Amino acid sequence: MNVNELRSRAASQEQDPCTLSNYRGFEVVQSSLDLNVSFEKKNVSGTVTYELKNLKSTTEVVLDTSFLDIEQAFVDEKAVDFKLEARKEPFGSPLVIKLANVVEKLKISIKFATTENCSALQFIDKEATDSKVCDYLFSQCQAIHARSLFPCFDTPAVKSPYSFHVKSPSYTLMSGRPVECSEENTYRFEQPIPIPSYLVAIASGNLAGAPIGPRSTVYTEPPNLKACQWEFEKDMENFLVVAEDLIYKYEWLKYDALILPSSFPYGGMENPNITFATPTLISKDRSQVKVMAHELAHSWSGNLVTNCTWEHFWLNEGWTVYLERRILGGVASYEAKQRGEKDYVDAGEKVRHFAAILGWNDLVDTVKTIPSQYTRLVWDLKTVTPDDAFSKIPYEKGFSFLFYLETVLGGTDEFDPFMKHYFKKYRYKSLDSYQFIDTLYEFFEPKGKKDVLDSVDWNTWLYGEGVPPFTPKYDTRLADECYHLRDKWAAYEQNKGQFSASDIEHFEVNQHLLFLGTLTELFSNKKPAPEVYEELRKVYHQYSEASNCEIIASWNDLLLKSENFKPSDKIVQNFATWLGTVGRMKFARPGYKLLKDYVDKDLAIATFRKFESRYHPICKAMVRKDLGLDS
């Protein structure tokens, strides 16, 4: 496929293969959800209403559903017949509503209820919550799970404003702006900014909030509130200010966060107005607050400007990682300036480049471990779901693409005006990779940079497998200490007796992760004697005592890949127990693979069986595949 042949299109011609709906036939003017949460039945029921414009004189409305009970359908408030077609794996069951009259404007309503097979929801019994006061519910609709919560055009190509009305016995949050409501156990929200279905979110439980900035509140269960507030209150407003300077004003008004129970499968989910986040961020050292910078960046990349299909997911995540690192660098620069450092801009760039080095290492590792077809920037998802293809590729290869473009186009001074132009041009819209490239030409050609863009190997970047066709030149000053210590361990025989806990005492968290990650890679290529691993454990005992999940995961990855441990060993048992406390797939999936591949497959399966009920449906399904339990 030639990328240049697909450029110069006002609207994307990409057909989303992950939806069974006829979304191209309609414009959604307004969406409304009227919901009822039942903790007794463990379901959500209600009515969804769409105000539509018929764009092509279409004679039927086809919506996505997955394991939903459909009770009734209405067209312009009149009950009509509907057909729920046979399930078409893995994308669900199309709901077909025939239109007796073809009119330009119409209103469709569907009464529905979720079932026990709903992949978007997790109900948690109160005994399993931290406060043990009441049951808990939360949703995760990305990528194509909204269709299991309510009938919808479940594609990022379709965006509309939403109104939410919810009845629940417990405090409820949704992805909109709260509206005052006097009805008991009733909550209302408005989302005036058009969003796709995957950004619809709900959480209900024993929740309390505390300020973490002038326009930000953190919510969580009351026993955890003070810890969550401390973790984020230092940085949240700084992140917002730097992001606004980079792009343009934050227009969602409030940026709030909900710290969920441990079964939440992701680091964070960028639900508008209320980021859902994992409790693994509460590390008591503010080292994981970078995830909040990432989710905040989604307020522009992903939420305002959206990939039109999941095949172009890198447009969401590559841009977001790029912005995240610019935000982290900007905050570091600001703090250096406050300390009176003269070269404060350089201080910020060091931080940005160090984060990029970690990302590049993750990218190289990921390429080695996933099917090659998923290492492309633009995926083919005709027969698989986005969850099957999900990895760090769209994040880190996408970032590398943007960093490469920044580099060849003349650095941030040249790239930043384009960035602002891009996010203004596609605000409230969805686009594909070819429109992105066309916008580069539109912006830079008048500036005399057409030859630079013509020299880019677009086809290899978008469709090539493996690592990118580009070796980045990052500032390695913060990384060099880590590399030096790694190299010292590589020459263990010459340096025996020269290691001590003080080697790593001054490291910040990301330096620990780089040291452990590069040492793991080194030892994977040339495995040292068991004595080396014993010395590591003895000298760097602080790693064994860590409470930071990133360090726990990296440390165990290093040790267990030695294949020196049996299932009965304490280190293995401790790691297996820890897996039962983390539902975040970043840790759960590689953790179970680690047990399976380097310790004992039966232990991995037994551990998963033991903790399976604690995990979110998405995590549970992916770990089952990883362990070969679905074959």
Swiss-Prot record:
It is an enzyme of class 3 (hydrolase). GO terms for cellular component: cytosol; nucleus. GO terms for molecular function: aminopeptidase activity; epoxide hydrolase activity; metallopeptidase activity; zinc ion binding. The active site is at residues 295, 395. It holds the Pfam family Leuk-A4-hydro_C. Its cofactor is Zn(2+). It is found in: Cytoplasm; Nucleus. Its EC number is 3.4.11.-, 3.3.2.10. Signal peptide: none annotated. Substrate binds at residues 140-142, 265-270. Gene3D superfamilies: 3.30.2010.30, Neutral Protease Domain 2, Peptidase M1, leukotriene A4 hydrolase/aminopeptidase C-terminal domain, tricorn interacting facor f3 domain. GO terms for biological process: peptide catabolic process; proteolysis. Belongs to the peptidase M1 family. This is Leucine aminopeptidase 2-2. The lineage of its organism: Eukaryota, Fungi, Dikarya, Ascomycota, Saccharomycotina.
